[in-house]
Amino acid sequence: MSAPESSPSTFYTVPTKHILSKAHLAAFQRSKTHSDIFNFIEELNEDIVGKKLTEAGQGSERTRPLISILDSVREIAESTPPVDNKLSRFGNPAFKTFYDKVGDASLELHKRIPGLPEEAIQEVEVYFKESWGNKQRVDYGSGMELNFLSWLLCLAKLGVVTKEDYPFLVLGVFWRYIEVMRYLQSTYWLEPAGSHGVWGLDDYHFLPFLWGSGQLRNHKYLRPKAIHDPEILGEFSKDYMYLSCIEFINSIKTASLRWHSPMLDDISAVKTWEKVNQGMKKMFVAEVLGKLPVMQHALFGSLLPFPTPEEDPELKRALEEEDGQSATDMHGHIHDPSEKGWSMDCCGIPVPSAFAAAQDANSHKGVPTLGNRPGIKPIPFD
């Protein structure tokens, strides 16, 4: 990461959407912001190789407030219980109240961060507020996870966190975010943003698998096929994100991994974690940063700028030639008919979360619990 991008004369802007067509997406892929995002992912990935979640430590004076902020988000959720919505297996309306509460608290939460310029909060907090799910659709997908990554990247660009904080950013801060998201997903039954189980990895997340495979890259004994061994999952899931995610998936879905998560099953046949990690990075570039249905929701400001037509002649030329190649739906989402891949199904048919599908609408009696929340039971598929 380069030197902090902040000075007394810095003009911060509220991030907005810029990717409206394939031409805009191509411009983003050529941009410095695209490089900054991927390089940040790679730097964090390299800094956690061989490191365990249980060895994350307490963080520094710079990063401990980030944990405090995430804990406060969890507390907001705990104080905003789901409404009685037994007739629906889709997202719980109480999530919208939670979303608004986080927005109301955001300014004060960001004031806890030492070294964060107050004038930068208006820009940085937008990524934070958009990290928890979509208020309108009551769903969650890789775009929101990307917003959280962008929030961390902005803090790094501002010099709020430094290179020595990078291991804790993943093993401490990011993992706490995942824990909070699991609570939100199970409490409010957030729908997966895309009806393919998103990437075929997890209904909601991608980065825990990317960085999780990075953690295991030089492990002497554990191999990708170890995800099929319940004893290994039981012993090591507390240490490694990848294994924890597998154990979590198994806890809410029955049948074999091959049935409910075929891509994870296929990946388990790869010989080394090194190859898994390389594949995950390529997949992220192609299926997240490279797909219009995902990146149309990306936000750009002064810290993560979008190139202008004047800065990118190819963009200017393409915009002049492009004519109605992408269609906007009732939600304001753009769909390109030529788009292929897992991420094409940005909206699709609403899909209930695994938690909602597992909920017995009539009675909780005799039903196993998950995370101390009654009525959640394993299901064969979502």
UniProtKB/Swiss-Prot annotation:
Ranges where the record places region Disordered: 363-382
Annotated localization: Cytoplasm
Family, similarity comment: Belongs to the PTPA-type PPIase family.
Lineage: Eukaryota, Fungi, Dikarya, Basidiomycota, Agaricomycotina
InterPro entries in UniProt: Phstyr_phstse_ac, PTPA_C_lid, PTPA_sf
One protein family per Pfam: PTPA
GO cellular component terms listed in the entry, alphabetical order: cytoplasm; nucleus; protein phosphatase type 2A complex
GO MF terms held by the record: peptidyl-prolyl cis-trans isomerase activity; protein tyrosine phosphatase activator activity
BP terms from Gene Ontology: mitotic spindle organization; response to osmotic stress
Keywords (A to Z) from UniProt: Cytoplasm, Isomerase, Rotamase
Transmembrane segments: none
EC supergroup of this enzyme: isomerase
The protein's name: Serine/threonine-protein phosphatase 2A activator 2
Catalysed reactions, semicolon-separated: [protein]-peptidylproline (omega=180) = [protein]-peptidylproline (omega=0)
Function statement: PPIases accelerate the folding of proteins. It catalyzes the cis-trans isomerization of proline imidic peptide bonds in oligopeptides. Acts as a regulatory subunit for PP2A-like phosphatases modulating their activity or substrate specificity, probably by inducing a conformational change in the catalytic subunit, a direct target of the PPIase. Can reactivate inactive phosphatase PP2A-phosphatase methylesterase complexes (PP2Ai) in presence of ATP and Mg(2+) by dissociating the inactive form from the complex.
EC number(s) stated in the UniProt entry for this protein: 5.2.1.8
